[in-house]
Amino acid sequence: MEASSGSSPPHSQENPPEHGGDMGGAPAEEIGGEAADDFMFAEDTFPSLPDFPCLSSPSSSTFSSNSSSNSSSAYTNTAGRAGGEPSEPASAGEGFDALDDIDQLLDFASLSMPWDSEPFPGVSMMLENAMSAPPQPVGDGMSEEKAVPEGTTGGEEACMDASEGEELPRFFMEWLTSNRENISAEDLRGIRLRRSTIEAAAARLGGGRQGTMQLLKLILTWVQNHHLQRKRPRDVMEEEAGLHVQLPSPVANPPGYEFPAGGQDMAAGGGTSWMPHQQAFTPPAAYGGDAVYPSAAGQQYSFHQGPSTSSVVVNSQPFSPPPVGDMHGANMAWPQQYVPFPPPGASTGSYPMPQPFSPGFGGQYAGAGAGHLSVAPQRMAGVEASATKEARKKRMARQRRLSCLQQQRSQQLSLGQIQTSVHLQEPSPRSTHSGPVTPSAGGWGFWSPSSQQQVQNPLSKSNSSRAPPSSLEAAAAAPQTKPAPAGARQDDIHHRLAAASDKRQGAKADKNLRFLLQKVLKQSDVGSLGRIVLPKKEAEVHLPELKTRDGISIPMEDIGTSRVWNMRYRFWPNNKSRMYLLENTGEFVRSNELQEGDFIVIYSDVKSGKYLIRGVKVRPPPAQEQGSGSSGGGKHRPLCPAGPERAAAAGAPEDAVVDGVSGACKGRSPEGVRRVRQQGAGAMSQMAVSI
């Protein structure tokens, strides 16, 4: 119907509805009088669509109104029940009088829904066209409509007594068939209208067949726009979720806030109309606009900084999320593209770095925060036939990388110590104000802290005072001030000075040597088997990798005799581990007169790549040689030298060191001799490593 030019404007335009700031209020609060009682809304979500039963029954559609005609009753059953608004039975005392002001109903059609920012233009135009038409009687053209459209969805039998030519039932069935996937009978029963409201609205819309048709279209349009859209977001979300599983979004949900994941949660917040997500990019709030943060499904949620109670706007429609903690940028780790701009006067270091990916994606895409995908290939372990070999190769390669760096640092530190000791021996006026340079105990060397302490303690205890010695000569001159029995300590100092000079000479000749490993020999290593068991960790890191248990042949040059020994390096399987051996070592052990407690050191030439071996023999203390010619005493009687200093030196475990250190008695048990040799091996290993 078309509005005449001279008709008065509709009531919805004369008295425009007042839109409050809070759009979350119910429509019933905005309608006064009986209109608040006439409209009842069901906010439950729609289930899956079953087949339509007959939408009306004689028992449920019985009315006790005497004021309504048969035609209006038939219309109520037709438009109310079939249109999805089953009339609510009421007692005769209530009555079904028309609305005092039917304009309230029409205003309601033009009101903005709490989930909608603007009214639907189709509904407003329909109302304007209907109100501009001249009114007609309510019952005109309705006497012949006596049947109630009852039907099942799509092709099934329709329970209707009206003829096929009737426009109203046919229009409703076409609408019902087109929306069969999104609506059910239970959904339609959730919205109720009184008979008086239907009659008054039909009369206001022109009455008769046209008024009834206009009212039915109005109701169905409202149902379709505000209720059928509730289920569509859920379907769209499922489809987009399936797409995102194959090709995930490069930007994940911020880990500090969760948006509604489906259409059901969004409908609970107000039944928003679903629209496809837009690809437009909105700059962050720090640059003057509303910060837009895409969700995992691809929709954009803009955060308004204004004082409005609705803080989230979904597709230009207000949405109130559940209350959460402070959503300021300092407390949340947004993706890197949307890191909030620091406020004026604040340092950029106060903001925490954002997480590279959202926890919701399980860490599968490490580059999600950076805007691109980078999936690391970590399936190489399953390609190998044996996981043990693969793990061993990785471990050995990792240990080699770490050991190379530690070896370089150790060599630099050793050379620095040697140069420092050389400079300290030269007389300088500043030598009295300088102290000894000692390396930090941060794991630079490959010897244990106990052996390092054993090497450093004789130097520190060689001086009776606690003041640190400024040079090796000062340390050697200090014991000379003591009585004659302290000559053993003087011998110890001479041995240390000789070792230091040998070390300086060896550093010049062997500066290209790299220390690999050392091994204190056991009884089985020096026996008739002719093989030496090597430490596993050092062998895997520094020696060549073995493919088979037969091993490889390695020529090793003896540093002491310059003789090349052809030894075989192999391993024995030990459960899931390995035991590395160095075979054909019997001749080398006999030529160097190595015994249990002695040790070997293996080097590698940095330039040529060849391997060198050195056998270090732990010599017995000279005190045992001096006491071997004395008389008296039993077999195990300790022949300690006389004198309080010698006795104190013999009783102090710190002074009982190798290479000519006095204080050891002749009658030591085999366990004591073995312990002394092991201590001497630790001291000699420190010298070997420093070279």
Swiss-Prot record:
Span list, region Transcriptional activation: 1-121
Keywords: Abscisic acid signaling pathway, Activator, Cytoplasm, Developmental protein, DNA-binding, Nucleus, Transcription, Transcription regulation
Region feature (Disordered): 1-95, 135-158, 384-489, 618-691
Disulfide partners: none
Ranges of biased composition (kind: Polar residues): 1-15, 420-437, 448-459
Compositionally biased intervals (Acidic residues): 31-41
Tissue specificity statement from the Swiss-Prot or TrEMBL entry: Seed.
Residue ranges: DNA binding: 517-619
BP-aspect Gene Ontology terms: abscisic acid-activated signaling pathway
GO molecular function, a single term: DNA-binding transcription factor activity
Cellular localisation: Cytoplasm; Nucleus
PROSITE patterns associated with the record: B3
Signal peptide positions on this chain: none
Low complexity bias (residue ranges): 56-73, 402-419, 460-488, 642-661
Biased composition annotated in UniProt, kind: Basic residues: 391-401
PANTHER family attached to this UniProt entry: B3 DOMAIN-CONTAINING TRANSCRIPTION FACTOR ABI3
Function: Transcriptional activator specifically required for expression of the maturation program in the seed development. Probably potentiates the response to the seed-specific hormone abscisic acid (ABA). May bind to DNA indirectly.
Protein name as it appears in the record: Regulatory protein viviparous-1
